[in-house]
């Protein structure tokens, strides 16, 4: 329930048009072939875990002994016995099985997290290519209009063939960039299709919603630790290790067996209840020592996992913050320095040459490209930063 709440909260704050992202991730989770296989494997593992928490098999015995001399007849023995764990041991075995179930679930959630992150990164890339394609289409339209105007000016003798050819090259380069961007977007959508189990999935968004970074990293990191399947895997590993240690310590307890036995000879028969006990004198000590070592190792792994995750997320947090600032500054500059209409008017009025127009537009276009790229990288960094909340 807690994970569902965190997932819903994350989807509300995501930086890529929430509902569209939410629907995409849900679709991938339902249809991804790897996740379906991992889920089946986890269920099979849990079934195997509980198959071990049963009573030992019933033991049946039959003896036929020939008498010597023959006058004493033969002896027939029949025995049935059932080994029985003490209730304490049986309860601990059940807890160990449940601990293994938790690990199987954690391993599935780690794989789920990786698949959903891959899908989310593809979504970020698709939005970037949509925005880039829209921008390149506008540039093609502008270059096409300028080329048509330059052709008329060339025919009128107002410009040289060099100016006209420069504009044609600009149009050709822009058209090529547009074709390349569409091909790269198709590749991203093809990858999304694979992640979605072979089902087509479309992405129409071309604008990112603003990223809202947590103000207090340490407090936010505590939330991540509480919900991260990677940390849960090591935490549940510690819990399982402690339960296995308790089971090993209970290995010193005797094991009982109850049964029935019948002995039949010539003219005589004995039958009744049998009670047995096995004493673990030799193996229990080594098992306890091994279990203690495994608990210590699990605790070290858990501590290292938390420290490693904090280091990674701290780096991603700083990177995301820097990329957001860079994209914001470029966007602010572009809004205050957009001279495209003025450049087009000046060129038509003959106030500036085609070369001057192209140089000015190229500077502006380079800034737009950097802005789109910075936004994309910021979104990708944010996706990696929040992947543990998926």
Residue ranges and their predicted role:
Residues 1-24, 29, 390:
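Bacterial Sec-dependent N-terminal signal peptides
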Residues 37-49, 111, 115-138, 145, ...:
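Amphipathic alpha-helical coiled-coil segments
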Residues 114-227, 316, 323, 342, ...:
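Periplasmic alpha-helical coiled-coil/stalk elements that build and connect Gram-negative outer-membrane
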């Amino acid at each position: 329930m807690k994970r569902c709440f965190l997932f819903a909260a994350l989807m509300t704050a995501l930086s890529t048009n929430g509902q569209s992202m939410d629907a995409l991730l849900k679709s991938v989770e339902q249809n991804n072939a790897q996740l379906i296989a991992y889920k089946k494997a986890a269920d099979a593992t849990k079934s195997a875990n509980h198959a071990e928490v049963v009573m030992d098999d019933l033991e049946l015995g039959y003896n036929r002994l020939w008498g010597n001399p023959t006058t004493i007849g033969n002896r027939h023995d029949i025995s049935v016995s059932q080994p029985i764990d003490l209730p304490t041991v049986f309860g601990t075995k059940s807890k160990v099985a449940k601990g293994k179930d938790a690990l199987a679930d954690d391993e599935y959630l780690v794989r789920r997290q990786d698949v959903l992150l891959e899908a989310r990164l593809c979504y970020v890339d698709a939005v970037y290519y949509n925005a880039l394609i829209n921008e390149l289409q506008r540039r093609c339209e502008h270059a096409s209009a300028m080329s048509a105007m330059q052709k008329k000016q060339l025919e009128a003798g107002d410009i040289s063939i060099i100016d006209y050819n420069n504009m044609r090259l600009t149009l050709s380069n822009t058209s090529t960039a547009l074709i390349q961007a569409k091909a790269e977007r198709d590749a991203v959508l093809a990858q999304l299709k694979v992640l979605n189990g072979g089902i087509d999935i479309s992405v129409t968004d071309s604008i990112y919603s603003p990223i809202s970074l947590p103000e207090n990293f340490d407090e936010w990191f505590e939330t991540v630790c509480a919900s991260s399947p990677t940390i849960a895997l090591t935490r549940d590993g510690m819990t399982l290790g402690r339960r296995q240690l308790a089971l090993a310590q209970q290995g010193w307890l005797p094991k009982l067996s109850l049964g029935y036995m019948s002995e039949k000879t010539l003219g005589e028969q004995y039958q009744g209840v049998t009670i047995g006990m096995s004493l673990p004198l030799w193996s229990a000590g080594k098992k306890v020592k091994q279990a203690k070592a495994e608990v210590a190792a699990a605790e070290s792994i858990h501590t290292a996992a938390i420290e490693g995750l904090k280091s990674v997320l701290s780096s991603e947090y700083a990177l995301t913050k820097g990329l957001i600032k860079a994209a914001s500054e470029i966007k602010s500059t572009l809004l205050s320095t957009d001279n495209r209409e003025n450049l087009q008017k000046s060129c038509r009025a003959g106030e500036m040459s085609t070369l001057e127009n192209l140089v000015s537009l190229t500077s502006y276009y380079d800034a737009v490209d950097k802005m789109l790229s910075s936004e994309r990288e910021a979104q990708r960094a944010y996706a990696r930063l929040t992947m543990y909340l998926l």
